[in-house]
Each structure stands twice: as C-alpha cells, then as structure tokens.
C-alpha cells in the first residue's frame, strides 16, 4: 500500500491526544503526505508513569508505521542484560537472601522486549512533529458533521473550533472521542477498576544490584506471589530499575476522577511484608513518596466498535488494557500502523476521484475496525488473566509452575509472534473490497 506522492495533501485529519499512540500515528501520517493536526488538552506533552516496554510485534509495527518512530524508541531503549524474561517465586522465604526459585523463562529474541522511560520516548516522538501541526490546551467537547457533509466540525471547551476530514481519538483511557462514538450513556464509554493497583517507582541501579544481584537487576523479572506480584526491569540505559508492585484490592478505587494517588514507601513495604527477601529488599529501596496507580481497563464493557462514520478511536481510547502483558502501548502502535496504511490508501482514492473523501474515509475506518477490534480486545482479556495467574488466583493454573509457564508462553507468543505484514496485507484487501 504505497504512500502518495509529495503533492498537495488530499486529507486533513485531526488526532485528539498527544500521547505515544497519537504522536506515533501523526508521524506515520505526515510521512505519507497526509496533513494532520494534534489537539492535546495539556499545555505541554507529557506521559504519566515511569517505565514502558515494547514487545517484538510492536517494534515491527513501528517500522511499518514509520522507521523514525522505531529509531526514536531505540534511541532511549535500555537493553536487558540477557534476552530472557524470567518468572520467579517472589513469595517463598529462602535462606539465600538473593535467591528466588526460577519457575519458568522464555527467550525474547535479540534485544526483544526492551524498556524505556516513557517521558524520554515521548520527547523523541515530539521531535518528529512540526510545531505547526500541534495545538496544545485543547479539550474536545463535541464533533458534528457540517451541513455540506464534507468536513467535521470540532468544538473545544475554550470555545474555539476546527475542521477536519476525519477525527482519530488517541485521547487515552478516559477518551472523550470514545464517548462520542459509543454514547455518553453507554457503559462501554468508560473504563472500570480491575481491582488491582500498583506502587510504581524507580530505584538507582547500583542499589538494586546490591539487593538483587547484577544479573537479576539487569534482566526483566516477574516476581510471583499470593494476591500480589512485582515486575522489575532496567530503564534509563541501565542506570535505574523500574519497579511496578501490584496488589489485589477487592474494594473500589476511592479517588474518583484520579487514576493515581500519593502513597508512601511504608504502604508498599507493608503490602509485601509477607513476601521473600528479594521483594522486601526492593520495596525498601523505593523512594519515600510514591504514586499508587489504579489499574483500570475496558474488560468489563468492551466497545462494540471503534468507529462511527469518520470518527475512530485507537490505543487506550479504544482498548485500554491492564499492563500484565506489557502490550498495551504496543497494541496502540499496531492500530497506528493499520490506520496509517489504510488512510494512505484512502488519500489515493480521493486523489483519483474514484470516491469522495468522505466515502473513502468511511471505508478506510470500517477496514480499521474490522482488522483491529478482535485482536486488541483479546489482549485486554488475556492481560486480565495474566494478572490473576501471577498472583496464583487463576484456577486453571494455581501455583503449578509448569501450567503457569505453558499458559504464559502461549499467551505471550500470541502477541509477540503476530504477523504484522499479514495484518497490513489483510488491511489492503479489506479496503479494496469495500470500494467495489
């Protein structure tokens, strides 16, 4: 599906939200000579959270989307000490204070599943987008179709307006575009608390090595336990250890509109007081003040569609996932790769006058919906299951290491081994059929 030649852009698109998915998509569209404007509600680009990882399928999608996006990631990615991902028993107490029983492991492939600091990756992506294509401080209120049927009218909370041929919502887990597509009274328009939350923090690597040993500190590890688990992996070029410590919370999240709340190291230490020495030592290394993040997702009420006419949603706005697969952001990159490819095809269609812009865009977004809905929602569902498995709550596996390993291996490779080239081939075929 080749891009159009460098003539006057045929399409003028609006992206709502300037996070990783929105910026990556914008870069891919601009590289295909499609004009795009990003509308971001914040006064500056910022990413919440600390570390983030991308699986091999996500890296292949970055390359397909725009090799510059992949280069931006690699510029800030931290290689693991080994190409292994290890799952260990973080719960049992052992006489050797650095020892945790290896339950199972998998080979990630050369430089597979690397992590980076979210803000550093975002900074690299921002460099790919000209300032003239960005509007900050813009909170979307509604989208309507103009009387002539050609343009969509965007209205913002500050009273300003804009026009676009199509609107792509990359506005995160509490997406306004999702509400506009599905309806404000639809439960699927809103994420739900998954009854897990996480203490998140960064630890200086030299202190982590003292507590865990060099290889463990510099290699991605999942520390399993009863009703809680901990993920550790290196970021910031190996200078920091990213720690994400999950706990099950049967109650409701008390902080209403906020997805995070201040927490103390003492709370994390107490939550993991029954775990083995390595996990307790890592908790002791956390900063005195932390954030505790509520894990919300779209599992309970998945969207029936990601599209309405010439509006669509992508990334967390479409299928916010719990982080237990480490695949949420990567799934958004897959979305972006499909959108960039099919919108480039729609631009060619409009340029040839075979269809109107509106007809071409409706067909393109219908294709996107058909290609992405099932897979992305499977990731949401499977991620929930892994969150239970890591805390010995998943009945089919319990604490059986062999069963846990087989389940994790199968589910992980469904994501990691995804054929991105085939996804794009099916995208092109589906779009062509819709034009016939």
Swiss-Prot record:
Induction: Expression is positively regulated by the azaphilone pigments (MonAzPs) gene cluster-specific transcription regulator pigB.
A GO MF term: pigment binding
EC number(s) on file: 1.-.-.-
UniProt cofactor(s): FAD
Null mutant phenotype: Impairs the production of azaphilone pigments (MonAzPs) but accumulates the benzaldehyde 6-(4-hydroxy-2-oxopentyl)-3-methyl-2,4-dioxocyclohexane carbaldehyde, also known as M7PKS-1.
Binding of FAD, residues: 40, 53, 118, 316, 329
Keywords, in A-Z order: FAD, Flavoprotein, Monooxygenase, Oxidoreductase, Pigment
Uses: As colorants, MonAzPs are widely used in various food products for centuries. Moreover, MonAzPs also possess wide-ranging biological activities such as antibacterial activity, preventing hypertension, lowering cholesterol levels, causing hypolipidemic effects, and displaying antiobesity and antitumor activities.
Biochemical pathway: Secondary metabolite biosynthesis
Superkingdom field: Eukaryota
Family assignment from sequence similarity: Belongs to the paxM FAD-dependent monooxygenase family.
Function: FAD-dependent monooxygenase; part of the gene cluster that mediates the biosynthesis of azaphilone pigments (MonAzPs), a complex mixture of compounds with a common azaphilone skeleton very widely used as food colorants. The first step of the pathway is performed by the nrPKS pigA that forms the hexaketide precursor from successive condensations of five malonyl-CoA units, with a simple acetyl-CoA starter unit.
Protein's recorded name: FAD-dependent monooxygenase pigN
Annotated organism of origin: Monascus ruber
């Amino acid at each position: 599906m080749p891009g159009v030649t460098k003539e006057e852009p045929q399409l003028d698109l609006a992206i709502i939200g300037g996070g990783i998915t929105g910026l990556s998509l914008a870069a891919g569209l601009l590289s295909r000579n499609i004009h795009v404007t990003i509308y971001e509600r914040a006064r500056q680009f910022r990413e919440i959270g600390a570390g983030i990882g991308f699986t091999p399928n996500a890296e292949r999608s970055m390359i397909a989307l725009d090799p510059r996006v992949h280069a931006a990631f690699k510029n800030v990615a931290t290689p693991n000490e080994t190409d292994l991902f290890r799952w260990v028993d973080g719960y049992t107490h052992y006489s050797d204070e650095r020892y945790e029983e290896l339950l199972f492991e998998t080979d990630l492939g050369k430089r597979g599943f690397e992590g980076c600091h979210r803000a550093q990756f975002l900074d690299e992506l921002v460099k790919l987008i000209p300032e003239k294509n960005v509007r900050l401080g813009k909170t979307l209120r509604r989208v309507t179709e103009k009387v002539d049927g050609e343009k969509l009218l965007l209205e913002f909370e500050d009273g300003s307006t804009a026009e676009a041929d199509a609107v792509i919502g990359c506005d995160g887990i509490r997406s306004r575009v999702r509400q506009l597509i599905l309806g404000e009274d639809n439960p699927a328009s809103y994420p739900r608390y998954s009854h897990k939350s996480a203490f998140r923090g960064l630890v200086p690597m030299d202190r982590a090595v003292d507590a865990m040993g060099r290889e463990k500190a510099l290699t991605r590890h999942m520390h399993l336990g009863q009703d809680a688990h901990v993920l550790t992996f290196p970021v910031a070029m190996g200078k920091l250890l990213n720690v994400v410590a999950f706990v099950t919370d049967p109650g409701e999240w008390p902080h209403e509109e906020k997805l995070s709340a201040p927490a103390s190291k003492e709370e994390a230490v107490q939550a993991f007081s029954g775990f083995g020495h390595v996990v307790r030592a890592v908790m002791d290394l956390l900063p005195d003040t932390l954030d505790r993040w509520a894990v919300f997702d779209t599992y309970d009420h998945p969207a029936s569609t990601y599209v309405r006419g010439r509006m669509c949603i992508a990334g967390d706005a479409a299928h916010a996932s719990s982080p237990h697969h480490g695949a949420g952001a990567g799934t958004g990159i897959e979305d972006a790769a499909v959108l960039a490819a099919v919108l480039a095809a729609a631009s060619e269609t409009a340029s040839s006058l075979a269809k109107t812009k509106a007809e071409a865009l409706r067909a393109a977004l219908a294709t996107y919906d058909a290609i992405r809905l099932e897979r992305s929602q499977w990731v949401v569902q499977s991620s929930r299951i892994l969150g239970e498995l890591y805390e010995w709550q998943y009945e089919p596996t319990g604490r059986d290491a062999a069963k846990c390993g087989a389940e994790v291996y199968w589910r992980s490779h469904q994501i990691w081994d995804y054929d991105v080239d085939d996804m794009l081939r099916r995208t092109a075929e589906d779009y062509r059929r819709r034009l016939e």
